[in-house]
């Protein structure tokens, strides 16, 4: 099966993603990893430990909008186009999402209702309550952990 893992960070960085991908590959699956690059000059396609890495450019400014993913849909719409391309180009049969901030982008891009696993590594809405930028005056106006909780 062609599994598309979705990570909204550069790769390789997170050992959990590598470990899960390796386990899936060892079980006979093809793993394609959607990830982002903040650099304009990057290797778009790569193979690392049998993981087919597909990098997409994301500006730092756009990435900062991921903090507003469930308040304003900018990040969702920009990333969903990239994810839609990834799904079609690689003929993905199952999606595996690693981060809540990109989940709405994946759901928006998944026009053919490919089976999807949402594998959250942390309880982001609870953690957000301790983030300095969420507790700032502007953060309290723009970022709602409650909206993330119901997402």
Model-derived features: where do they sit?
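Phosphate/nucleotide-donor binding subsite
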Residues: 58-73
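Soluble or luminal CAZymes and related metallo-dependent hydrolases
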Residues: 16, 71-79, 146-150
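N-terminal subdomain of nucleotide-sugar transferases
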Residues: 1-41, 45-47, 51-52, 88-90
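An aromatic- and histidine-rich active-site surface loop
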Residues: 14, 40-42, 76, 94-113, ...
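Generic beta-sheet signal
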Residues: 34, 56, 119-120
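Short, flexible, mixed-charge acidic loops at enzyme active sites
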Residues: 48-54, 129-135
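Short amphipathic alpha-helical segments and helix-helix/interface helices
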Residues: 18-22, 84, 106-107, 151
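Membrane-proximal helix-turn-helix segments that form the acceptor-binding/catalytic region
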Residues: 80-85, 124-125, 139-151
């Amino acid at each position: 099966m062609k599994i598309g893992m979705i990570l909204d960070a550069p790769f390789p960085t997170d050992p959990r993603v590598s470990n899960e991908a390796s386990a899936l590959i060892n079980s006979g699956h093809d793993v394609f990893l959607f990830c982002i690059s903040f650099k304009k000059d990057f290797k778009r396609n790569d193979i690392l430990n049998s993981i087919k890495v597909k990098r997409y450019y994301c500006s730092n400014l756009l990435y900062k909008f991921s903090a507003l993913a469930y308040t304003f849909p900018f990040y969702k719409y920009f990333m969903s186009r990239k994810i839609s391309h990834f799904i079609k180009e690689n003929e993905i049969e199952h999606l595996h999402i690693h981060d809540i901030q990109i989940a709405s982008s994946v759901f928006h891009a998944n026009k053919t209702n490919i089976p999807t696993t949402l594998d959250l590594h942390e309880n982001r809405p609870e953690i957000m309550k301790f983030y300095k930028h969420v507790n700032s005056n502007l953060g309290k106006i723009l970022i709602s952990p409650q909206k993330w909780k119901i997402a």
